[in-house]
């Protein structure tokens, strides 16, 4: 059964078994993206128990945090006369403008207190350069500045990545596509994600991921 608000898979995967070559990437499960947050993703809190459950089967877990400066270039408030969810052309490409969110050191930028993943090994903070956004856990939106995650994973001989979190159509999708570009087999755990879906972004994200070779899976199909 597909959770409400999720598009039907374009490229699904059969059940897979987790082993020592696998890592779970938990993307941006932060207070700003949860109910009551400044950029709340609809039903975003519903991913938390799913992620907690599947994380128990992974020895290798990486988490990410959006970590913006005040006045970040992705904020609508930084562009006079612009409103959230409008777009602007910046030097690195088209940028969706967002409400102020995940500002460094604020409670909104904190990871959900309900996450229970004590074995998480690494937290990647992204979007901390004021003049460029960063959806992906691997590469900033300029397509050049890397976070070092790919090298970290490869040094540990991790080859298969499972991506969960918020939001499906932005940080999850960009992370999954960049994971494929870096040579990793990549799955998105559909029921462990939720999307924003602005101007058709969710359907486009799934199509882009399928084109890149990213596979979809449900949490029930992951065998530890």
Enumerate the language-model features and the residues they cover.
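Hydrophobic/aromatic ligand-binding patch that stacks against planar heteroaromatic rings
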Residues: 178
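Short catalytic/ligand-binding loop motif for oxyanion handling, primarily in non-cytosolic enzymes
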Residues: 69-73, 132-133, 171-172
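Alpha-helical scaffold elements lining the catalytic groove of polysaccharide deacetylases
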Residues: 131-156, 160
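Active-site acidic carboxylates
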Residues: 5-6, 11-128, 155, 159, ...
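Glycine-rich anion-binding loop/nest that anchors nucleotide
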Residues: 158-174, 188-194
């Amino acid at each position: 059964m597909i959770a409400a608000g999720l598009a039907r898979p374009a490229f699904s995967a059969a059940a897979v078994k987790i082993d020592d070559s696998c890592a779970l990437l938990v993307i941006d499960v932060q207070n700003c993206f949860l109910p009551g947050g400044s950029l709340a993703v609809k039903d975003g809190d519903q991913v938390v128990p799913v992620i907690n459950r599947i994380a128990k089967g992974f020895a290798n877990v990486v988490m990410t945090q959006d970590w913006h400066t005040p006045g970040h270039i992705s904020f609508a408030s930084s562009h006079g006369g612009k409103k959230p969810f409008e777009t602007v052309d910046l030097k690195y490409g088209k940028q969706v403008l967002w409400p102020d969110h995940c500002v460094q050191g604020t409670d909104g930028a904190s990871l959900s207190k309900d996450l229970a993943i004590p074995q998480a090994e690494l937290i990647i903070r992204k979007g901390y350069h004021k003049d460029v956004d960063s959806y992906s856990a691997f590469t900033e939106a300029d397509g050049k500045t890397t976070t070092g995650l790919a090298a970290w994973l490869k040094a540990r001989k991790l080859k298969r990545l499972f991506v969960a979190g918020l939001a499906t159509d932005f940080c999850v999708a960009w992370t999954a596509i960049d994971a494929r570009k870096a040579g990793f087999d990549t799955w998105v755990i559909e029921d462990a994600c939720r999307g924003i879906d602005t101007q058709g972004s969710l359907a486009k994200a799934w199509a882009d991921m399928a084109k890149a070779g990213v596979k979809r899976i449900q949490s029930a199909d992951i065998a530890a």
